[in-house]
Amino acid sequence: MATNGEEQQSQAGRHQEVGHKSLLQSDALYQYILETSVYPREPECMKELREVTAKHPWNIMTTSADEGQFLNMLLKLVNAKNTMEIGVYTGYSLLATALAIPEDGKILAMDINRENYELGLPVIQKAGVAHKIDFKEGPALPVLDQMIEDGKYHGSFDFIFVDADKDNYINYHKRLIELVKVGGLIGYDNTLWNGSVVAPPDAPMRKYVRYYRDFVLELNKALAADPRIEICMLPVGDGITLCRRIQ
């Protein structure tokens, strides 16, 4: 018969193995949050998209339901209207954003894979918010560089959400800080990166976790030292760092 310690270790192992979208060490506590306050208030269209995404082989890439709820409320609190999203996947966080912003709000959405986006697009269209989305397929950096060169986009975005290639987060930040307005927010997802940011370098990790770990650590250090922003790192989902531009 397993001891309590063995059971806890086994639960922790399963927690990591399934790529859990929460840093809570108790699966029961996370399920309580989802079943008590997230799923009962989740819009039907977001539930449908979440269930569609769950069948995709890369479903670990999606935004968690609790983080989607958080983003939706945050956007309403800051009255965001002109937004950007880098890294779309099937569009769960994109739909959360589209539902939160006003009818004439806009989202510039960028991802290297249109096929994944089109998996969720019928749900987005059925929700009546597809007209708010300008989707661009391809790398985001050239688009950002062109926007900065044009000049008219400086300080024009109320909110920007980044959930893409972690090895480019620093490069995104260098550009996005010019495009978000003073008082606007940038949200960087996965900044606690499966909890690996506090793990010893030789700790057992999945290959992709180990590969991106140093890039996430570099980003966190850079954001903490950037005088142009105020920051708040939250243990929601896989960690999200909010950056408010102050100068």
UniProtKB/Swiss-Prot annotation:
A divalent metal cation binds at D163, D189, N190. It is an enzyme of class 2 (transferase). Its cofactor is a divalent metal cation. Gene3D superfamilies: Vaccinia Virus protein VP39. Keywords: Lignin biosynthesis, Metal-binding, Methyltransferase, S-adenosyl-L-methionine, Transferase. Substrate binds at K21, D163, N194. PROSITE patterns: SAM_OMT_I. Pathway: Aromatic compound metabolism; phenylpropanoid biosynthesis. Binds 1 divalent metal cation per subunit. SUPFAM superfamilies: S-adenosyl-L-methionine-dependent methyltransferases. This is Caffeoyl-CoA O-methyltransferase. It comes from Populus tremuloides (Quaking aspen).
